[in-house]
Amino acid sequence: MKLSTKGRYGLKAILDLAVNKGNGAIAISSISERTGITVNYLEQLISKLKKANLVKSIRGAQGGYMLARDMTEISVGDILRALEGDLAPVECISNQESSCESANLCVTKLVWQRINDGINNAVDTLMLSELVEQSKKLNPYKLNLDKNKC
């Protein structure tokens, strides 16, 4: 499984919101400035995160975006699925109906299922709050979300 820029940049954007959560609602231009993600692309990402009830918008002069839930309640899996959809490596084990006629007889399906289980376990047990703590340990003065980095 390879994540698209939606998943990678969306995770950076919500991590920026989490790191800066004590500053009230955060303008999308501020997120863009810190992460190097264009405002237009951020608007698309934030829209998906809002639909998944991970981010909320605040209107007005001091408006912007903030987390909709506590960061201890938001998993990386929640974020990635909101942006990418199902994380299954192959169609036959996704939550969607498979078009593969031999899915029930497929020996390699066991491999794909184990990979899927491992991915889901990893992203569902890693919370946004853990990423915030890790970012503070790595660089307590600046969140490293440079667009040229992973």
Model-derived regions, located:
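Short amphipathic alpha-helical interface segments
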Residues: 10-22
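A short alpha-helical element within helix-turn-helix/winged-helix DNA-binding domains
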Residues: 30-35
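Key DNA-contact positions within bacterial/archaeal DNA-binding proteins
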Residues: 40
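Basic amphipathic alpha-helical segments that dock to polyanions
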Residues: 45-50
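Residue cluster at the C-terminal edge of the helix-turn-helix DNA-binding motif
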Residues: 51-54, 82
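Beta-hairpin "wing" of winged helix-turn-helix
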Residues: 54-62, 66-67
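Conserved segment of winged-helix/HTH DNA-binding domains
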Residues: 71-96, 108-109, 113-117
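C-terminal regulatory/oligomerization modules of transcriptional regulators
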Residues: 94-150
